[in-house]
Structure formats: C-alpha cells, structure tokens
C-alpha cells in the first residue's frame, strides 16, 4: 500500500477528511521553505503538495505565480526541490508528498532520471497539470511503474464522456478543481461540490480531494463534510507574500495550517 493509500485509509477509518496543503518549493527561500515543509505535518497537514517552480505557470493565479517567481529568484531548481524532499524524509516517513507542476522542467531534466531520483527522495505522487491522459506513456506510465502515484485533475468542464478517460490510469486520489479557471479563483457553492463529488464517485473508488478557492477554516470545514480531502494553496502562499521576514513567513503559514486543520478535523463531529 502506498503512503497516499495508507493515509487516506487511516483518515477514512477515523471518519474525517484530509487537509492537503500546497506550498511552492523554495518560497521565500530554500531554508525557510524547508522549515515550512518540515513544520506542516505537526501543524495538521495530512498530505503535502509541493510546487515545482516553472517559468510559465499558466494554470496558476497571481499568488502562486508570484510564489514561483520568488522561488526562482532565490535560486530554486528541480534538483533542490528533490533535495528538500530528501531532507524532509530524514524526520518524516509517513506524510505523503506530491510534487505538483508542469511537464517542461521534468522533460528537460530527463524523465527516467527524474522518476528514479523522485522515488529515491521519497516522493509519493505527481500532479502534472499540462499532461493529459493521451500522453501517459511520457511520464504517468514510468512513474506508476516506479511506485509513484499519478494524480489527475478534474474540473466542472470535464464531462461524463471525458471523465472515464481522465480517471482510467489515475492513482492516489482525484483532485477536483471546484472552480474553472486559475488557482486562487473564487470558491464553489456547497451544492455544486456535492453534485460534483457524487458524479465522480460514480466513476471511481479513489479518494476525492477538492481544491481551488478554499481560504478559511470555515470553508475548509464545509468541504471536509463532503470530500475525502480539502486542498488549500493560495491562502498559505499569500501568508508568505505578506510576511515581512522569512521567520514570519514560516510562523504565519504554520499558524494558518493549524487553523485550517482545526476546521477540517471538527467538520464531521
């Protein structure tokens, strides 16, 4: 059983949803980013999505675009992102880490080298936003062969004809993007999310995590009553942007994570 399967199974047995947190690797700098990464589990993160900075993050809103820029300006590379995961794994062998980003940097790095090093570093899953199922052979197939889950995005515009193709080779969990558009956009209504999850459950037994537009503990709790996972990214990244120092960034991100975790954990009581 993979770390992702294990974590979602444990939480299902506990009767609660997972808090899935997104931060960009290397934002606001390597050391502070590593502190955040290492601090997230104790602050209540059940699964961590770690963004791989790329110069053209087309699916991301302003907050994550700026985070990517900060990380790149601080010298973050794919090699350093994998090193961060290695350093995280020294102290934590249980919290799943999913790398999220775009195909171009992986292609340039070399797919086989990337998959080998990602597995060795302790990466559990990949979300590659610009690689559709038609291109499975390029990365999804070798990644899954190495034991790395390949997580697909589904959106309100993924219709019933397309959905089986998207979900066919998915593993780990399904990431439902509740609002069409870029990350950090407005949030969806509870009714919309309820309907969307019911539709997805007709097509897959995988855990369903819902993200995009969730910013507060109250919003997180609302989604946690419906979904297997609640994804929060832009709200955490905004804390880094607003911080006056790297130390403040670490403190503020982990404080918000704790508040979100309280919302998620109390949602079904």
Curated annotation (Swiss-Prot):
UniProt keyword list: Amino-acid biosynthesis, Aromatic amino acid biosynthesis, Lyase, Tryptophan biosynthesis
Give EC number(s), comma-separated: 4.2.1.20
For this UniProt entry, the molecular function terms from Gene Ontology, in alphabetical order, are: tryptophan synthase activity
Q: Which InterPro entries match?
A: Aldolase_TIM, RibuloseP-bd_barrel, Trp_synthase_alpha_AS, Trp_synthase_suA
Question: Which residues catalyse the reaction?
Answer: 49, 60
Specify one Pfam family. Answer: Trp_syntA
Q: Whom does it interact with, and what assembly results?
A: Tetramer of two alpha and two beta chains.
What role does this protein play? Answer: The alpha subunit is responsible for the aldol cleavage of indoleglycerol phosphate to indole and glyceraldehyde 3-phosphate.
What is the protein name for this chain?
Tryptophan synthase alpha chain
Which organism's genome codes for this protein?
Answer: Pseudomonas putida (strain ATCC 47054 / DSM 6125 / CFBP 8728 / NCIMB 11950 / KT2440)
């Amino acid at each position: 059983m993979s770390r992702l399967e294990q974590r979602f199974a444990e939480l299902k047995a506990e009767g609660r949803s997972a808090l899935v947190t997104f931060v960009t690797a290397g934002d606001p700098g390597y050391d502070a980013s590593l502190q955040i990464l290492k601090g997230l589990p104790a602050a209540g993160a059940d699964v961590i999505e770690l963004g791989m900075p790329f110069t053209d993050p087309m699916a991301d809103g302003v907050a994550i675009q700026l985070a990517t820029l900060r990380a790149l300006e601080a010298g973050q590379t794919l090699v350093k992102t994998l090193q961060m995961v290695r350093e995280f794994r020294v102290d934590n062998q249980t919290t799943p880490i999913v790398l999220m980003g775009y195909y171009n940097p992986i292609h340039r790095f070399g797919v086989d080298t990337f998959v080998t090093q990602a597995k060795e570093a302790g990466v559990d899953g990949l979300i590659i936003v610009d690689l559709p199922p038609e291109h499975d052979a390029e990365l999804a197939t070798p990644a899954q062969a190495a034991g790395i889950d390949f997580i697909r995005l589904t959106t309100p515009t993924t219709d019933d004809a397309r959905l089986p193709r998207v979900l066919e080779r998915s593993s780990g969990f399904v990431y439902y993007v509740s609002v069409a558009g870029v990350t950090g956009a407005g949030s969806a209504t509870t009714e919309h999310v309820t309907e969307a999850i019911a539709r997805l459950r007709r097509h897959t037994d995988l855990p369903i995590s819902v993200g995009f537009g969730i910013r507060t503990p109250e919003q997180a709790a609302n989604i946690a009553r419906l979904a297997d996972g609640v994804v929060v990214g832009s709200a955490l990244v905004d804390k880094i942007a607003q911080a006056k120092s790297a130390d403040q960034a670490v403190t503020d991100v982990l404080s918000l994570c704790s508040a979100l975790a309280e919302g998620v954990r109390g949602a079904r009581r």
